[in-house]
Amino acid sequence: MSFLIRSICFLILIPSFLITFVSATQHLCHSDQKDALLDFKNEFGMVDSKSWVNKSDCCSWDGITCDAKSGNVIGLDLSSIFLYGQLKSNSSLFKLRHLRDLNLANNNFNNSPIPAEFDKLTGLERLDLSQSSLSGQIPINLLQLTKLVSLDLSSSDFFGDESFHYLSIDKSFLPLLARNLRNLRELDMSYVKISSEIPEEFSNIRSLRSLNLNGCNLFGEFPSSILLIPNLQSIDLGNNPNLRGNLPVFHENNSLLKLTILYTSFSGAIPDSISSLKNLTSLTLSVSYFSGKIPFSLGNLSHLSHLSLSSNNLIGEIPSSIGNLNQLTNFYVGGNKLSGNLPATLSNLTKLNTISLSSNQFTGSLPPSISQLSKLKFFFADDNPFIGAILSPLLKIPSLTRIHLSYNQLNDLVGIENIFMLPNLETFYIYHYNYTKVRPLDLNVFSSLKQLGTLYISRIPISTTNITSDFPSNLEYLSLRSCNITDFPEFIRKGRNLQILDLSNNKIKGQVPDWLWRMPTLNSVDLSNNSLSGFHVSVKASPESQLTSVDLSSNAFQGPLFLPSKSLRYFSGSNNNFTGKIPRSICGLSSLEILDLSNNNLNGSLPWCLETLMSSLSDLDLRNNSLSGSLPEIFMNATKLRSLDVSHNRMEGKLPGSLTGCSSLEVLNVGSNRINDMFPFELNSLQKLQVLVLHSNKFHGTLHNVDGVWFGFPQLQIIDVSHNDFFGILPSDYFMNWTAMSSKKDNNIEPEYIQNPSVYGSSLGYYTSLVLMSKGVSMEMERVLTIYTAIDLSGNQLHGKIPDSIGLLKELRILNMSSNGFTGHIPSSLANLKNLESLDISQNNISGEIPPELGTLSSLAWINVSHNQLVGSIPQGTQFQRQKCSSYEGNPGLNGPSLENVCGHIKESTPTQTEPLETKEEEEEESFSWIAAGLGFAPGVVFGLAMGYIVVSYKHQWFMKTFGRSKQQNTRTR
């Protein structure tokens, strides 16, 4: 009976038990969390989330993870689902209080800030907001999420796009992060604008396994102790050029798998203890300042597959132990000072895919055993003094797809006739220093290479006749520059896929064939520096043409200007003999960005229709023509215009007021015209203006705003208003607000040129050129360094004292205030200009002594104080002793032993005209004297390598021809 009762009770309880069991296994999500998710869906219009419907259990929805016991939503993965819109502080997302894992990566939150309300999600362990177009300052509240083990706030560089909005942090963020997030294992803040030092406390996050601080604008000394965190497996400090540091002595218990230090200011030796990183698979120590030898112990890193030591200051030979790295696939050591022969052990690296040896001092030939690298695809050995038959061993590696052998000292191209043995070759670069030592190259050797897409040959004589019909038709890029070609290569017309053609720096004469402009895929042509004289008579711009870049500069073209395509973005016809007016058809080039028609014989006025180009134009160079009339009012919408040069023409009238619309303008040059106007103070609204040249016009009035407004122009680095009719007294605080010339430059940053880097079909960029008076002579700079600073007020009617505030311009390198009516004393504040290289205050009425403090200016290579009323001794400084006597003449009151050392027995002199022969000798002496002073005398070259860059760009014959004897005489007599 009892058994029966128990059985009945059991049967009665079964349904209740089953109901309880089913309830426990269904894990129905809570209604409030379902509602929050649906509200979030509506906030962003998630059209692709078909599973997100009210009738189903949200735990089964795509991207949702629920807790098995409670049914709470603990995971939300909405990465890469094209969310678009503002992530707002009242978002229903923040109602999901049980979240542990949240991934919103790769969406577009439309530059909205990260809401502080994330701190409500106190259970978060993983948060990924990467690549989601968030901007603004990261809220400090985020650091209250103390359970975080993974935090990803990274974004991308977008190639330096200034319009891109980055995330940023305040100074307290990193120290607080190090204190609060002690459980953190993964931190990625790449391209967050940190803009600070990394605190030492980071080394206390002992759980840290992965740290990515790429592109964070870090500076200061990086704590090396962070590299010694025992659990750290990956660290990336790349693209922080102002971040200093050294590699520590590594310990055996290090867990590093990947170490990336790229484009930083890290320095010092690579320690022998690098061999302690037994598990390392990727080592990148590139574009920094590491020095010394590659340690032999590096060969102990048996798991290493990627090794990059490029662009440092490493010396010595590649150690033979490198052959022990049998897992290595990529090997980069280019851009160092490595020397000697390549080790034969390189042949042991049978998994190698890439070798880069470029820009070193390697000698000898390639080891024959390198032909055993059967998986090698990319071989770069440019710019080394290799000799001998370097090609021969490479021709035995059929896997090769890319070979760069430019800038080597090959005795000959031995073996190139066997290049057909590389059937997979896609890219071939070869350049020779001295093509007179190389036999002519027959282009037919490339005819069997059906995969060849890029062929770059330079400074090797070639013959373009008798080219076979099966010449590689898949070529997309063909460069035959400096190859001694005399006739236009006919075989090119067979290139049905050709996109880029470079025939520059040859001796091609005659006319450009009409078929060139009809090639359907061609988008870039460079025919510069040849002897071409015209175009086929029937040629017209083809409406089907895809040409975006054409360079016809430095030829013998004459007659009307020819425009081969309506899709041009870059066009240069400079240094020819084009005549006539600028054709109105140019106004139809709606995509034109760079137009250079300088140094021709174009005449007439600028067509008003150029206004249609102003929305796209970035560089307009019309200098040295015969253009006339006024500059038209066409610039109001020229917001992209970076450089405008109409110098050395016959322009007249006033400067157009619409220039204030050129908000991106960096260079304005209207020198050597007939413009009659007052100083354009209204242009101080152009916050990017770096170069302003108004010389040799009819400008008049004062150089300071009588309304008391500051001079402005915060970025101005070069101003030349010489040889005009400016008058008046410069106020004592005149130079007070010249920010770019007074702010200290970072000496660790490599000097750059003022340029537009985006020249289509060219890697060289489009550089700003300029003619300036420096050290007594006119000079043409084909490229202008951004650190170059100059003021030229000479040849006006300025008077009064030279303002003491001139001493604030600590970055000033050239100062010319000659041929005015300045009075008073030479301001002693000039001694503050430690970078000053050229000082000309001649032809004034300045009195008193030369301040002895100027003798401390070790950079001052050229001085002219002649024809004033100076008295006393010249300073004792070496620079003053090295000047010519003419630098002091016309000052009867100057005396003393220092002057006698320079001039011997002193005779009073007056500025008179001299014989033509004497003038010619003097101008040449003067020209070369400042070059000698700037380069040959070490204390005068604080400018260092940067000044060298400028000097190599000077065209002595050109500016002597253009600004020769009469210019020199005028300078002396004023």
From Swiss-Prot:
Topological domain ranges for the Cytoplasmic compartment: 952-974
Keyword Coiled coil appears in the UniProt entry: no
Compartment(s): Cell membrane
UniProt-listed SUPFAM superfamilies: L domain-like (SSF52058), RNI-like (SSF52047)
Residues covered by region (Disordered): 899-923
Cross-referenced PROSITE patterns: LRR
Segments annotated as LRR repeats: 96-120, 122-145, 147-166, 181-204, 206-229, 230-252, 254-277, 278-301, 302-325, 327-349, 350-373, 374-396, 397-422, 425-448, 454-472, 473-495, 496-519, 521-542, 544-570, 572-589, 590-616, 618-638, 639-662, 664-685, 687-712, 713-737, 785-809, 810-833, 834-857, 859-882
Extracellular side, ranges: 25-930
Xref: SMART domains: LRR_SD22 (SM00365), LRR_TYP (SM00369)
Topology term for the membrane: Single-pass type I membrane protein
Transmembrane segments: 931-951
Pfam families, per database record: LRR_1 (PF00560), LRR_14 (PF23598), LRR_8 (PF13855), LRRNT_2 (PF08263)
Secretion signal span: 1-24
Disulfide cross-links: none
GO cellular component: plasma membrane
Residues modified by glycosylation: 54, 90, 253, 279, 300, 348, 434, 466, 484, 529, 577, 603, 624, 637, 737, 816, 845, 864
Keywords, alphabetical: Cell membrane, Glycoprotein, Leucine-rich repeat, Membrane, Receptor, Repeat, Signal, Transmembrane, Transmembrane helix
Family assignment from sequence similarity: Belongs to the RLP family.
Name of the featured protein: Receptor-like protein 7
Biological source species: Arabidopsis thaliana (Mouse-ear cress)
Upper taxonomic lineage: Eukaryota, Viridiplantae, Streptophyta, Embryophyta, Tracheophyta
